[in-house]
Amino acid sequence: MVDLKSVQKPLKERYRADPESSRITLTARGGQEGTPIACSVDIGRAVYEAQAHTGVGGAGTAACSGDLLLGALAACAQITCQMVATAMGIPTDRIAVEVTGDLDLRGTLGISREVPVGFETIKLHFDIAAPAATPEQLAALREKTEQYCVVMQTLLRPPEIKTEWAKGN
């Protein structure tokens, strides 16, 4: 098992001593494929295919952007919950997170201006088996998990998004 405190201790010490060293930039690049309903996504450590959802004409053989957003939230929430439980000394047998999102495709297809483009509701369901945990510990686990989950906090408090367009050759 990973000793989380010993792994994070030198990082926390460095970030306290040099706050600027805690700032990172993550990058993802989408590249054109042979079809207008798919692209490759390169995050530097992995490359994967994304497709349009079948409800807007995609083939359904790869994750759509909505799947990836929900997957990012599920991964972040699950890993954050595991890390917080470990840091709090709460033994767990299982931590599973299911994320669902509801949207109306008429918005993205331009069928109705009254229908928003994007998710209307996103729901998270945590399934935690921690037989020895007290109700107070589970309440604190929930609070800290929601507080420290980067993707959840980003969705709750959207950052400024800047776009830049360049005409290629």
Where are these regions (language model features)?
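Alpha-helical metal-binding/catalytic segments enriched in His/Glu/Asp
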Residues: 72-77
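Extended beta-strand/beta-hairpin segments
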Residues: 1-71, 83-169
